[in-house]
Amino acid sequence: MEIEKNNRINSLLEFYEQLLTPKQKEYITLYYADDYSLGEISEEFQVSRQAVYDNIKRTVNILEKYEQQLHLLSNFEVRNAKFDQIRAYINQKYPEDTELKHFLDDLEKSEEE
């Protein structure tokens, strides 16, 4: 469960980090992406552990709120699942069609940009 939560927060951060303040971005990145403890973050920024905890908790809530309103992560996951289905279909039905595979690769790359 904890790994899934970390992965989700890191994914949300990729989509919404530009909407966070610099301090929110730093705390949540250190905690979830870089695996710092609350104590390590509090020492680095010379604030209490409670202040760090409150900031991180508030930031997670903000990220979840953005996702509820904008659905960027969930839409991305749906599109990726569709790409996987299309790729499997192409590999099964048209295994020799390199041009079709190339088109799908290009479409997938444009999605990532």
From Swiss-Prot:
Q: Which InterPro entries match?
A: RNA_pol_sigma_r3/r4-like, UPF0122, UPF0122_fam_protein, WH-like_DNA-bd_sf
Give the source's domain of life in one word.
Bacteria
Matches recorded under Pfam families: UPF0122
Disulfide bonding pattern of the chain: none
Which family does the similarity line name?
Answer: Belongs to the UPF0122 family.
- Give a short account of what the protein does: Might take part in the signal recognition particle (SRP) pathway. This is inferred from the conservation of its genetic proximity to ftsY/ffh. May be a regulatory protein.
Q: What is this protein called?
A: UPF0122 protein PEPE_0845
This chain's source organism reads: Pediococcus pentosaceus (strain ATCC 25745 / CCUG 21536 / LMG 10740 / 183-1w)
Its organism's taxonomic lineage begins at:
Bacteria, Bacillati, Bacillota, Bacilli, Lactobacillales
